């Protein structure tokens, strides 16, 4: 699983050089502390959850249905009300979120044959204090061990 997470982070960082940070989600956005400063725009990946089932009677082989959450965080300091001349920032944010999803949907890694392609299960957007807009998607995939 750790190789999958590293491969996913590398894929995002390589395909989205405009991101200032691509990292495992360790709660960086949920704290007011400056110990681990977050720069924007960024993508944080984590909150993995796997439900396992045995493929044989001995339990030596298993298949799991996993989910992982990808959060794109963007600083929305710009005044984006209609007539503000910054209205295009809204479209730019949604475009980046869409491009990120398009790069992840059906993503598979040749060097990880036990990980099956990603499939988006849900998405939402919300705002954190400090004008930080979050575009969050949860992807599912199968994993064998």
Regions found by a protein language model. Name each.
Residues 41-45:
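A short glycine-rich, His/Asp/Glu-containing loop-to-beta-strand
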Residues 1-37, 48-145:
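Charged, amphipathic alpha-helical segments and their flanking helix caps
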């Amino acid at each position: 699983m750790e190789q999958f997470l590293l491969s996913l982070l590398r894929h995002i960082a390589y395909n989205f050089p405009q991101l200032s940070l691509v990292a495992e989600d360790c709660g960086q956005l949920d704290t007011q502390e400056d110990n681990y400063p977050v720069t924007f725009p960024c993508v944080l990946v984590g909150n993995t959850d796997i439900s396992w089932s045995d493929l044989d009677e001995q339990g030596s082989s298993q298949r799991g249905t996993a989910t992982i959450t990808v959060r794109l965080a963007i600083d929305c300091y710009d005044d984006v009300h209609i007539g503000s001349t910054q209205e295009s920032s809204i479209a730019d944010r949604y475009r980046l979120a869409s491009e990120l999803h398009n790069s992840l949907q059906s993503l598979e890694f040749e060097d990880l044959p036990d990980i099956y392609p990603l499939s988006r299960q849900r998405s939402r957007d919300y705002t954190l204090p400090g004008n930080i807009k979050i575009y969050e998607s949860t992807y599912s995939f199968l994993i064998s061990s």
